[in-house]
């Protein structure tokens, strides 16, 4: 096996020309930032004027958080891992004061026991996206 390998996600959100959905490097899987895009929905709109890399799930922070974590689940499954293999999460919220508690409630539905290390910060996120999550998972190859 190569030292690093692109993780392809056939049932995940649309691919991007400028990044890999995830990279496996040895026993670690590094997932790019994921948002609440619906799987199988193509990019739409005009670049620079409302362009989206796919169709964003309707609803608020709760819906976007669930879809984002489900997208991470799909990505990790494509790499042979699960949400339980995540060791570190970085979360970016458009409005941390407004959305943190609702995001955290949904997050805790997925990570009930031994949750991963996590950082959550506020960030200006593209278009109508309220949340972006990236993660690192540990899943030995052998």
Question: Which residues does each PLM region occupy?
Answer:
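N-terminal presequence-like segments and the immediate start of the first folded domain
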Residues: 1-70, 74-87, 93-142
């Amino acid at each position: 096996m190569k030292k690093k390998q692109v993780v392809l996600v056939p049932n995940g959100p649309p691919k991007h020309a400028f990044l890999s959905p995830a990279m496996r490097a040895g026993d670690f899987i590094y997932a790019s930032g994921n948002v609440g895009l619906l799987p199988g929905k193509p990019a739409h709109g005009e670049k620079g004027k409302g362009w989206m890399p796919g169709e964003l799930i309707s609803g608020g922070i709760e819906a976007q958080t669930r879809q984002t974590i489900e997208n991470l689940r799909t990505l990790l499954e494509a790499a042979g891992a699960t949400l339980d293999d995540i060791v570190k999460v970085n979360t970016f919220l458009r409005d941390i004061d407004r959305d943190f508690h609702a995001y955290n409630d949904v997050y805790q539905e997925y990570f009930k026991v031994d949750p991963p290390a996590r950082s959550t910060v506020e960030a200006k996120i593209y278009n109508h996206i309220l949340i972006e999550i990236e993660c690192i998972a540990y899943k030995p190859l052998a």
